[in-house]
UniProtKB/Swiss-Prot annotation:
Coiled coil: none annotated. Belongs to the LDS family. The lineage of its organism: Eukaryota, Fungi, Dikarya, Ascomycota, Saccharomycotina. It comes from Saccharomyces cerevisiae (strain ATCC 204508 / S288c). Residues 114-115, 235-294 are extracellular. This is Outer spore wall protein LDS2. Residues 322-356 are annotated as: Disordered. Residues 1-92, 137-213, 316-356 are cytoplasmic. The chain crosses the membrane at residues 93-113, 116-136, 214-234, 295-315.
Length: 356
């Protein structure tokens, strides 16, 4: 047998063993996973890994949803606290102007390229059912659809201004180190890595793993896009609902990513754990902030105040975590005074047993 070290999947312990291999312990080699089945096992692991990851994410939601919902229900008011924090405060003003300008630019582009097509399509759909009411309803629906798409584009950008808002909030709340960390962030564009080299296009792994997974995800995203399209056609309620969904393109978790990514520098695996473990509070924040974002034009201002509200929630979590827990003191037992006794305390305590 070869003495070269094998990959982790090659070794096997008893399934009920709760501890890793001890020092000097010989691993048990699976008889079915020999060197001849090395490539077959790699292909199996390529399919097994995403299934295991999805299962772990589902278990994180299942184990923490109700506890997090009970402990973090106050987060639903924090978008409105962001508004009250921003009113009359000039520290956020220049950041709000930049976000609002970027919002208006996206809204104008969306209206220019999609409004005529969307309005015509909606009129054709609503006209047989609503008659003359189809024209104003299609107009209102087109505005809401454009607002929803604009929110997705603004929040879906790797936006350094959200991080700057966190820096202002941290400075106002006395968290100097975190504020300095936010101010030193610079925008770095994404680097797209090639999944396969040219030689990999002719490998067995490409045809058995990469290509099937590509089509699975492709049709899955097509299905999601089709469901969102049907939801957008629902008058008034549809676009507002999409803004409120936590897994939609404009989910509320985008407001918290600057802290976890730019300040804590979490990788994708840890960020995914944070998202699924706290799914309940992101859901509540998505619902509350999505209602504000659905207001046309003013939604561009509310995106900035929603970021302020998210930073206030992070400040609250930091202070709650750093504040030491004080155990409750036991209630003091009432003392029975002894009338006319000047004896020491010990003798007073036994006076009722041995009276003078």
């Amino acid at each position: 047998m070869s003495t070269r070290p094998q990959p982790d999947w090659y070794y096997h312990r008893h399934p009920y063993a709760s501890t890793p291999l001890a020092e000097g312990e010989e691993p048990q080699l699976l008889p079915i996973q020999d060197q001849g089945n090395h490539k077959k096992s790699k292909i199996w692991m390529a399919y097994k890994a995403p299934i295991v990851r999805w299962y772990k994410n589902a278990m994180l939601v299942k184990d923490n949803f109700w506890k997090d919902l009970e402990s973090s229900h106050q987060i639903i008011w924090y978008p409105y606290k962001g508004i009250s924090e921003s009113v009359g405060n000039s520290d956020y003003l220049h950041l709000f102007f930049l976000i609002f300008g970027y919002y208006l630019l996206n809204l104008l582009l969306i209206v220019a390229f999609t409004s005529i097509l969307a309005w015509s399509l909606l009129v054709c759909i609503y006209l047989p059912f609503l008659g003359l009411f189809a024209l104003p309803l299609a107009y209102m629906q087109t505005i809401l659809i454009s607002t929803t798409l604009c929110n997705s584009m603004v929040k879906g950008t790797d936006f350094v201004l959200f991080t700057r808002i966190y820096g202002v909030t941290f400075a106002r709340k006395g968290l100097t180190e975190l504020s300095e960390a936010c101010e030193t962030i610079s925008f770095t564009p994404f680097v797209y890595r090639r999944s396969h080299r040219l030689g990999g296009l002719f490998s067995k792994r490409f045809y058995l793993v990469s290509l099937p997974q590509f089509f699975i995800f492709f049709f899955w995203y097509i299905f999601i896009a089709f469901m969102f399209l049907l939801l957008l056609l629902v008058p008034i309620v549809g676009p507002i609902t999409i803004n409120m969904l936590p897994f939609s393109p404009g989910m509320g978790f985008y407001y918290f990513e600057p802290y976890f990514v730019d300040v804590l520098h979490l990788d994708s695996r840890k960020l995914s754990k944070v998202y699924y473990k706290g799914f309940a509070k992101w859901l509540l924040y998505s619902i509350s902030s999505g209602l504000l974002e659905s207001i046309p034009i003013l939604g561009g201002l509310f995106i900035g105040t929603n970021a302020v509200g998210a930073s206030l929630w992070i400040v609250k979590e930091i202070k709650d975590r750093d504040q030491p827990a004080v155990p409750p003191s036991p209630p003091a037992e009432p003392e029975e005074p002894t009338v006319g006794s000047y004896a020491p305390p010990i003798q007073q305590s036994i006076a009722h047993i041995n009276p003078p």
